[in-house]
Amino acid sequence: MKLPYSWLKELIPDLPPVADLEPTFAHLGLPLEGVEDVPAPVGGVLLVAVKAAEPMEGTQLTKLTLDTGENGEKTIASGAPNAVGLPAGTMVALVTPGTTLGGITYGVRPMQGVESWGMAASAKELGIGESNAGILTFPAGTAAPGTPLRELWPADSVLDVEVTPNRADVLSALGLARDLAAYLNLELKEPQIPAAPTQPGEIRVSLPDRGRVLDRDPQGKLRFGCDHFAARAVSGLQNGPAPLWMQRRVSLAGMRSIDLIVDTSNYVMLELGQPTALYDRRDVAGDGLVVAFGLREGETVKDLLGNTHQVGPEDLLILDAGMSDEPVMTVAEAFASAGQPKEGSHVLGIAGIMGGDHGHVRADTRDVVIESAHFDPVLLRRTSTRLGLKTDAVYRYERGVDPLLAPKAAVRVAELLRAAGGTPEAGQTVVGTPEVPQTITTTGEQIRALLGMHIGTAEMRESLTRLGCTVTGDGDSLTVTPPSWRVDMVIWQDLAEEVARLHGFTELPETLPTLRVHESNIGASAQSEARAELRRTLAGLGFQEVVTYTFTSDEEAQKARAEAPGVRLRNPMTTDRTGMRTALYPSLLRAAGAHPKGERALLFEIGRIFPAAGEQERLGLLMRGDLAARTYQDGVRGDFSVFKGLVQGFAGAVGASFALEQLRGDDVPAALHPGVAGAVVWNGERVGWLGALHPEIAQEFGLKGDTFLMEAALPLPGRDWAFRDPSRAPAAWRDLAVIAPQGVSYGDIVGVLKGAGGELLESVEPFDVFTGEQVGAGNRSVAVRLTYRGAKTLTDEEVDPVFNAQIDAVKARGWAIREK
């Protein structure tokens, strides 16, 4: 946020110089992003009065006859669009002959038959603003003709303050001055604003019911549509340039000066932090304003810039009351009561965001209706984000505007317009019941314990009072009611932060915190530690962790043959991030594709997916390329057996059992090669799948060579551990060769042998695979070593029954035992 130092100095007369303020802002938690020194206009720029503005026939120029004071009457030719029809008396900034500006020295020169004496300049040309849409103009009587502009527009310093999202109260000159005055313990001189009239005005206002349930708000985060609204009419205005002092402040704050009415609205927002809107009263039918939840789905509203927006039942709009004398809930109801008027003709604006094409002020506006309101910040944020409308007003609303400020801001606008020649009506309509700050109860000891600072309770009371809080309580107790503008002060920890801020964060002692473990956090800590263990183990095996977006698109899901996104984003950041992913492996494929070609990739990710069944946490692994660098000899090529071995090593490292069950037919995930796919069995439970990436998908993602994937649900099932003394007895072995069809997986064979092996069977290890005429066409022989161990040395009489039971189990499956 940008503000001129002179504005803050007016509010805090004893404010230190700019050079001394940088540490102060840092201590307040509002660091300065920069300080820009803005020089005064050069000495040869004078304020002069327009006597006549005449179009020059056959040209795009306007002849201006000027009263320059001591230099008498002069003429210039101007091509500025706003020079046409300038009223007599209007003052402009004239660059006089002999003055150098922007490297150009101006003089007297003939232009289309007119002797042009210098140039009427824009704010940008003078270096005092960003607008170059036309010449800089001021109201008649701003100064005596011939007055140097620098006398009324002195040099200044513009402070660029970094404001955190929770500190909406400092998004104004008054709010920032309050904080500075409280910290520096200096006197604050607030703007003199009369009390709001107690009698209602001529403008009627209708608000929507509170507590309305919206389809897209099942958790009730939206508290209200509009809970406070002030409206007042001002008549007899002569719209034109704003006063010089107002233009100066608006320009230095980074906004473009438009005209008296618009600048006044912007000025009050910059001064008090309350956005306002002003409508041409000619367009406010029925002298009433209706705040209503949006049009029927799919209807459109045109904003004051001419852009069309599609709005729906959950967007808050401002309408005139010409359609009905009764309060309405929705615009659709209002349309129905009016017999379907022309689309958009009665919509005055999108509440709190931007005015509409109908009702905005124009050059010939004489009478206005002031709107000053408090809207639901969540509702406005959603609407502005969806419509892509980010304005200075919604920037403040979505962070939290003072809910009680609306009537005061309306009075301020009315009084500034009165000073410019307007006549505010005697009354002011105020409707709604805004939320008031809730009382917070704490103790000095509680705050001291949190901060670790020895601050007396009396000092805490004094600090909070300086911030505008109402503080009561005896002894060590503190009962605090925050000011209405501090919507961020809700719990006692917020009070502790404010005490520390005013006392000085630099005074915080360097002490180790006292950590308290609550029983409700034990489960969460265990889950976090389990994830950390997974990460450490996988990193030890050579995998690198990647963290990718949970967003994806239909196109990417289709490329990866994954389920299309079911959860859609209303306002996607980009076209390739339109929904929530339903699988983890497409993200890993994208990350692998970003690796330099030819390099190996051992990647893992622990992340969330959002399929139709609901949100899940997953572990994904990917391997491609060589496992060892290729130099003068071949490297270690990453194949399926290597990848499976890495997963087995991972399981062993975390004390889990791992098995792979072959998948066939429709059970094979679409991402995998039909012949190299298996189900991951972890501690006896199926948790996911593992296999080779389908070649067509690899081609889609630009991955050459073999790529292997695993995806499993988290948390991985644990084992029920029971301690057993290691046996001191030796093991007994038997070798067995099983002849089975080649379609039978090794995992199936092991499962049969383990199922019949009982407690004596310790392990099953393969040592030979054979195919040939001896075992029959379409078959293969898998030879395994069976290891048995008991509490004592096993005899043949104890081992043979178990071994024979395993042989019987094999034969029962229709398989054979190879004798030779």
From Swiss-Prot:
Residues 39-150 form the tRNA-binding domain. It catalyses: tRNA(Phe) + L-phenylalanine + ATP = L-phenylalanyl-tRNA(Phe) + AMP + diphosphate + H(+). Its cofactor is Mg(2+). It comes from Deinococcus radiodurans (strain ATCC 13939 / DSM 20539 / JCM 16871 / CCUG 27074 / LMG 4051 / NBRC 15346 / NCIMB 9279 / VKM B-1422 / R1). Binds 2 magnesium ions per tetramer. Tetramer of two alpha and two beta subunits. This is Phenylalanine--tRNA ligase beta subunit. Keywords: Aminoacyl-tRNA synthetase, ATP-binding, Cytoplasm, Ligase, Magnesium, Metal-binding, Nucleotide-binding, Protein biosynthesis, RNA-binding, tRNA-binding.
